[in-house]
Amino acid sequence: EALKYFTEFWCSDNTDPIERLFIQWGFSQIFPSKAMSAHVTSWNKKTSVKFRTDVASMCKLGFDLGLKELNADELTYCQNAVANWTRLKKVILDGDQYRLVSPYDGNHMSVMYTTPDKNKAVLYTYDIHPRYAEKLLPVKLQGLDPSKRYKVKEINLMPNSKSNLAANEKTYSGDYLMKVGINAFTTNQAFSRVIELTAE
């Protein structure tokens, strides 16, 4: 009912990125991502700027962060992340959302968005508080065309760092990605990946 009168809303004053994973997961059961404002803030500096930004970028991305708080690499990262979000916002804000792994069921979370024509998708994966040497399961994607082939590319990387995602820059069928999945989770705390999939 409220969305008849407002184009977006503030889910919570709590902007701790760990808490936001649970908050945004819950709100997404009812509200579309384009209606949920999510800002990068200074809350929980134990987490990286990358993690905080990747959490906020699964909704309507914003920043409430003093630029003087950021070092050169963090500032460059934020600029690149905003550019990627702007380039992909039609997928994130207007695409079909698939909730893949619930933070309420374990130590990880994953959400993805796909375009209606199934030619582009964005996958988000988050490691929250993994247990030591826990068994990591592949993330099985949804909403792809099983007959199409998709190029997998990890984006939103820190400057001078390389992706260690085994599937990075490789091509898989939609059928494989949905039935077998990709190994995107890690045993790192407060670790995130943003993965772009493009049909070839």
Task: Identify the meaning behind each predicted range.
Residues 1-68:
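Glycan-recognition surfaces
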Residues 129-200:
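C-terminal beta-sandwich/jelly-roll accessory domains of carbohydrate-active enzymes
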Residues 1, 64-66, 72-74, 130-133, ...:
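Flexible loop/turn segments at secondary-structure boundaries
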Residues 56, 123, 152:
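Conserved, mostly hydrophobic/aromatic
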